[in-house]
């Protein structure tokens, strides 16, 4: 996420390219620097060219997909990032040279690009089948984390003598008594729901959890870097079929494509060509040639994963 912040911070330069003219940007005892002089200097740099590329892309994306990205969608993503960083959110923004407003602007740009990918990428049956192999639907679990394996075994022994109807309440008591996870021990050990795409949980933990049916718990302690876990499955809808999860599988493939430079290049090329872009400054005529020259020969199809 921090890398993402830093990458977006560079886009803040976009404001410097707007409304260039004779107004003064800065003064010194050696003379003044006008907007036009600043523009002439900046446009010759790679950063300046990248900024103009982004400005153009934002314009055409907004025109083509603006009605598909709502204000609430931007706010939802913004709140997610804010929640991830908690009390350090403001400092991370500051270190990246961004404000809350500029972050929301770039979130919108990213969501617009995602709409373009969805519109220009064809997800094949083969890709759906491959994605389904590792797919697990969203599940809800509770866990008890302890530092010693013997303690976890004691908890499991207790659960074995517990009736199924009393399992959740007993697990809640044991979590409060034994768990070292302060964030969940007083909540019955319950974690936020997750699926196979979740990256916040230990892979060993997820693998053990996905094997459980609703109401089942791990028969042996699950060892991770944090200690030993006893996991109780609160709700597992089952894997089901590709047809049942086609929408979610497609979404996951599109999310993967958002990190695929080849797919993004081809999508941007199509979007720019459709945008009828015309560069008026002769010195910048070729800044989009890498995209526009390839748009007629490159097809935007989802990459094979």
Swiss-Prot record:
From which residue to which does the signal peptide run?
A: 1-19
What kind of membrane protein is this, topologically? Answer: Lipid-anchor
- Give the positions of lipid attachment, kind N-palmitoyl cysteine: 20
Where are the S-diacylglycerol cysteine lipid anchors? Answer: 20
**Annotated PROSITE patterns:** PPIC_PPIASE_2, PROKAR_LIPOPROTEIN
Entry keywords, A to Z: Cell membrane, Isomerase, Lipoprotein, Membrane, Palmitate, Rotamase, Signal
Catalytic activity, per the record?
[protein]-peptidylproline (omega=180) = [protein]-peptidylproline (omega=0)
Job of this protein? Plays a major role in protein secretion by helping the post-translocational extracellular folding of several secreted proteins.
Name by which UniProt lists this protein: Foldase protein PrsA
Question: What organism does the record attribute this protein to?
Answer: Levilactobacillus brevis (strain ATCC 367 / BCRC 12310 / CIP 105137 / JCM 1170 / LMG 11437 / NCIMB 947 / NCTC 947) (Lactobacillus brevis)
